[in-house]
Amino acid sequence: MRKLMIASVRTSLCAVVLGALALPAIAQDNPTLTVYTYDAFAADWGPGPLLKEGFEAQCACTLDFVSADDSISALRRAQLEGDATEADIILGLDTATIGEGMATALFTEHQLDLPDFDIPLEWTDEVFVPFDYGYFAFVYDTQSIATPPASFEELIALPQDFKIVIQDPRSSTPGLGLILWIKALYGDEAIEIWEGLAPHVLTVTTGWSESYDLFLSGEADMVLSYTTSPAYHLIAEGEDRYRAAKFDAGHYTQIEVAGILASSPNQELARAFLAYLVTPEGQAPLPETNWMYPVLEPTGGLNPGFAEMIDPQPALLLDADEVTANTRAWIEEAFSTLR
């Protein structure tokens, strides 16, 4: 009987030890892929939860989205954390901030055989992968504004109590997009446009979500957003009162991208996620949660409501190297008029 008891204890101890030794293996078999992104992407109503569900169903992993006010803020966080960062991917930089991202030396090549994208330019970048795109615009409420401005000059000419809300270009990609939009149209005369806009700027918010909430609450007449933003109200709410003001001179293009950090211990898994993101299945959640155009035909096609959005042509886009070289000076130029 004593021998049986001793044998039983030994068996139990072995089971405990073996179980403890197995824990790291189990954890390794179910790794966590951490994606730093902007708040709207990771929100309950954003594409994050749907992408998490779809990717986790096939990856034997946990997909964790960590949000900041905007993607530039997410990049700054990863910079501060250095090699100790938990981020495997930064998602939400764009064609205006790719150069800044590369300058950090945080990223590694994606090593993916990418599909042919339906975007406004040929994609050859070996580090960043595009996942959606759109065009910047000012959104207004037709119940308050019958005839919106069709140019920056017309906006400037409105009474000073006509207010817009914009985003900080140092922390927000739409905010930087406005800088580039004006620079693309006016070049060296951009500061004159900023001087004219300054009296109309109600506030400059850190990120897009805060500014759009201010607009919807009636604090401002127009908000810097996207030509596709009214698609949300039309498709999700059945409400057609919100529109994007069509500027005859054109709208600035934004292509959003994701990149893998060189410090990531999960680079193979990170590549798998980026590959998934640019499949029809991975693209499917984006149009009706992020309210941008997909980079390729999504599963189920594109909702017909998007066909009712304004035509952004001519589409504007500055040379990436020019943007990288001049961003700081252009931001300072704009802010000199807003102080």
Name what the model sees in each region.
Residues 49-65:
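Short alpha-helix C-terminal cap/hinge motif
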Residues 32, 36-48, 69-73, 85-220:
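Extracytoplasmic ligand-binding site segments that recognize negatively charged/polar headgroups
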Residues 96-100, 216, 220-241, 290:
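A ligand-binding cleft/hinge motif common to bilobed small-molecule-binding domains
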Residues 261-315:
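Mature extracytoplasmic/periplasmic domains
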Residues 190, 294-339:
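An extracytoplasmic/periplasmic, membrane-proximal ligand-sensing/linker region
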Residues 137-144, 183, 254-266, 285-288:
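A bilobed periplasmic-binding-protein/Venus flytrap-type ligand-binding module shared by bacterial periplasmic
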Residues 117-120, 134, 194-198, 204-205, ...:
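Periplasmic-binding protein-like
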Residues 107-114, 126-130, 153-156, 234-236, ...:
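Short beta-strand->loop
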